[in-house]
Structure formats: C-alpha cells, structure tokens
C-alpha cells in the first residue's frame, strides 16, 4: 500500500520509443543507419544466429585461438540485419547480445550474454529451439507484412574435404518455400 507524503517512482507505461534508423545491437559506431533503397519495403525478416547463451556451437582452433560458432554467426547475422534494414525491410533480431555489436576483429571473444529477445537462453536444446520458434511465431502473427521469412545463421566446423557453403531448409509441400 502507498503512504501519504512518500514520493514514488513509477515505471514507464511502455518501453522508450526506439530512434528511427537506429539499432543499438549493431554497436555504437554502426547503430545509426540510412535506408538507401525501398527494395525490401513490405518484407519482414526474423533473424536467428545459431546457438548462443550457454551453447557456443561448433568450436574450431586457429593457432592458440578458439573460434566459437555462436560469436561468428551472431556477427554475420547482425551484418545481414543492417543490410536488410538499409534496403527498407522490417527486421526482428531474435538472438541478441547488448554488448557485442558488429565486430571487426579476426578473433571474436566468446561470451554467454546472448538472450532470446531479453529472455535467458535455456541450456536444453529442445527448450532452446522451442523458445526461438515461439518468439518467431508470436511476432509472425502480429506482423502484417505480405512477405515474411525466418533466416537461421550457422557457421559449422567442417574439414576441408567436406565443406558445404549453404543449406536451405523449406516446407516440402509449400511451393513458395521451395521457390525461395
């Protein structure tokens, strides 16, 4: 109960409005961006970088450095997000790290700070995948775009004899999905 004469600070009714053409997840130097075309106006993308939080994904070695898949996938996903935004698309960044931003170092330090849009990422793989798909499905139902696609970025560790560049997964019985 409230007491007379005591000052209380109330939380805001909604989160602070985000600046136009500004995404702090890109890092201080790249947070502001310009929309340079309307090529993707009306398109909405749900971007997910592989693994994250308690799961670093594949771990490679280069000299004395460990290369953690989740860090490189996250960096690639942020670059893709920025590119899509500059071309007029709506972009939802599902896996987020408020500190990393887009990085230009050859070796990216591993962290476990990533969240699923603010929620901690579960260790259990099934729960982790369900969390991501639930978040995308919720946003998908709210978004009123004609063109909506989810893109999952992974950077798998392969030996030179078995390198595969890109995998596309789609719904078998959906001609639009096959066309993509």
What are the residue ranges of the model-derived segments?
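Boundary/activation segment at the start of structured domains
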Residues: 14-59, 65, 78-79
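A broad, low-specificity signal marking well-ordered, structured residues that form hydrophobic/aromatic
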Residues: 8, 45, 166
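Surface-exposed beta-strand edges and their flanking turn/coil or helix-capping segments
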Residues: 60-62, 106-107
């Amino acid at each position: 109960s409230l007491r007379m004469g005591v000052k209380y600070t109330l939380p805001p009714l909604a989160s602070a409005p985000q600046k136009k053409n500004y995404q702090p997840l890109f890092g201080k130097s790249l947070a502001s961006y310009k929309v340079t075309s309307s090529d993707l106006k009306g398109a909405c993308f749900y971007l997910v970088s592989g693994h994250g939080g308690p799961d670093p994904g594949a771990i490679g070695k280069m000299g004395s450095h460990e290369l953690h898949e989740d860090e490189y996938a996250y960096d690639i996903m942020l670059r893709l997000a920025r590119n899509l935004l500059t071309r007029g698309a709506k972009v939802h960044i599902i896996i987020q790290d408020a500190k990393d931003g887009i990085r230009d170092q050859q070796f990216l330090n591993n962290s476990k700070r990533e969240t699923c849009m603010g929620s901690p990422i579960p260790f259990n793989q099934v729960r982790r995948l369900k969390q991501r798909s639930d978040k995308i499905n919720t946003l998908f139902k709210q978004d009123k775009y004609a063109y909506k696609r989810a893109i999952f970025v992974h950077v798998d560790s392969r030996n030179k004899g078995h390198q595969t560049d890109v995998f596309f997964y789609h719904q078998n019985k959906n001609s639009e999905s096959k066309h993509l």
